[in-house]
A protein has these predicted regions:
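Subset of outer-membrane beta-barrel
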Residues: 17-359
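Sec-dependent N-terminal signal peptides
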Residues: 3-13
Length: 359
């Protein structure tokens, strides 16, 4: 018995690899949290399980008559040459689904959509302002330390129903909300040049006519800017599905409303502090479109393909991290699955083998 429980725990864990750092927009987009769909080329519409239910696909949820309570948690580790190693452990989703009639399912849940959890970025090298550009008439050295934390979450309601023998549909409505803090510490120093490296904080050295000059930082001053942003908005998505004996087609359209942002800036310099608050919102709506197809080769195997076109998330530009807007996304996903079914009554009914790729 212990062996079977151990195998269930091992096979229920999903592993994903991050290849970039989302220091723009509102942070990292939290994608698919279902390990089964991740293995199927990061699919949104298909999972390859025996019921062909995908957590992120409202038009498939009616296929189960059971009440389902789900919690997903994930750990991310990111190592780059530009920034310190980043470690993140967070709750990725929570949801409850239950039947409300024949072939009808209702559900609600909470999950993050964009997130930066304690992201720390520090300039490794000093930057310089020459005496001809400095307001003090003397050279200045400076560097920044940034701390970014928070993002946007969604509280969602969804409904799924089988409409006819071949057609089903689903709808999902989300309230978007969240807070994000960006702390910017700017350290500035007066720069003095000397032929001796002793005394003061050495920040650089220069060779001039075979003589070495050492740049030293003195009279350090820290200027701190705390930006607190409060987000609010909504989105709605509708999905339709057609399925017959061999083929399955899915189409999904999501509309994002205008995101409202309330920003509070607090500037602290030496012994003075100033605070200002303002509100603004995105000027346009945005939309996401997805199209999927699954072909059943045999009763226990099949292949799938999906195409997604996602518009940039609609936030005001001055509310984006480092004023860099999130990009739009276009992707294509391929997946395949094979089910090993157990004809005997026991501790397991089938073993699913999946593979996929996306770009």
């Amino acid at each position: 018995m212990k062996i079977y429980i151990f195998l269930i725990l091992i096979t229920g864990i999903g592993f994903s690899q991050a290849t970039g750092l989302s220091a723009y927009g509102v942070g990292e987009k939290i994608h698919n949290s279902d390990p089964a769909s991740l293995a199927l080329g990061n699919s949104s519409f298909f999972s390859g399980n025996s019921k062909h239910i995908s957590i992120d696909s409202p038009s498939s949820l009616w296929r189960s008559t059971l009440t389902r309570f789900s919690i997903h948690s994930g750990f991310n580790y990111l190592s780059t040459t530009q920034y310190p190693d980043q470690h993140q452990q967070n709750l990725t989703s929570f949801s409850i689904l239950f039947p409300v009639g024949i072939k009808k399912v209702f559900g609600f849940g909470l999950q993050p959509t964009y997130r930066s959890n304690k992201l720390n970025i520090t300039d490794e090298d000093f930057k310089f302002i020459g005496a001809d550009e400095s307001i003090t008439g003397a050279p200045i050295a400076y560097r920044n330390t940034y701390t970014i934390d928070g993002g946007i979450s969604e509280l969602f309601l969804l409904y799924s129903q089988k409409l006819t023998h071949n057609i089903s549909g689903g709808i999902k409505y989300s309230l978007l909300f969240g807070n994000q803090i960006l702390n910017d510490e700017l350290y500035t120093y007066d720069v003095e040049f000397d032929t001796s490296s002793s005394g003061g904080m050495l920040i650089n050295e220069f060779v001039d006519n075979e003589d070495t000059l050492y740049a030293k930082a003195n009279n350090g001053v820290m200027t701190e800017i705390n930006k607190h942003r409060k987000f609010s908005g909504s989105s709605i998505s509708a999905e339709g599905r057609y399925a017959d004996e061999k083929h399955e087609f899915v189409i999904n359209l999501m509309l994002n409303g205008k995101i409202n942002v309330e920003t509070t800036n607090q500037l602290t310099m030496v012994n003075s502090s100033t605070t200002n608050t303002f509100e603004n919102s995105a000027t346009n709506f945005s939309s996401n479109f997805g199209l999927g197809y699954r072909y059943k080769i045999l009763n226990n195997s099949g292949i799938s393909v999906e195409i997604h076109n996602k518009s940039p998330f609609n936030i005001p530009e001055n509310a984006a991290i480092f004023n860099i807007m999130p990009p739009g996304e276009k992707s294509i996903h391929f997946g395949s699955y094979y089910q090993i079914r157990n004809s005997k009554i026991g501790y397991w009914n089938n073993l699913n083998i999946r593979g996929g790729a996306y770009t």
